[in-house]
Amino acid sequence: MKIGIFDPYTDDVGGGERYMLTIASCLAKEHSVDLFWDNKTDVKRIEERFSLNLSKINLVKNIFNGSVSFKDKILTTKKYDSLVFLSDGSIPFVLSKKLFLHIQQPITSISISSKDKLKLRRVNKIFVNSSFTKGL
């Protein structure tokens, strides 16, 4: 299975990055995993700080940084069986077969536009860190 991972905060080298790249590392044991990020140094810092083995994760061009055209982003995401996306409050429009959205802020505090409601239909699962984040 071909899986893409995106964390817009990869350069923060914090707990969320540990969480996302631990997921990537686990998935890479049995699947082909690509991390959408342009700076290898950031990934190396995460690997060292959190003692993660990221050797099986492929670093690929960050198509979510705004410099890639909508068409190119869509065509690239279509090549993936699954995408795991750490949301910065946005919901991506992608054409992967499956989309998993990780949210780190309380869902009740996120305003969802009509456009986002349409994009949510493509999300297979939303996962959160805690009951607090879920807004319970």
Locations of regions flagged by a protein language model:
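Extreme N-terminal starter segment of soluble prokaryotic enzymes
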Residues: M1-G4
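Membrane-proximal helix-turn-helix segments that form the acceptor-binding/catalytic region
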Residues: I74, I107-F127, F132-L136
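Active-site regions of enzymes building and remodeling cell-envelope glycoconjugates
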Residues: R49-N62, L95-Q105, V123-N124
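Active-site proximal beta-strand in glycosyltransferases
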Residues: S82-G89, F93-I112, F127
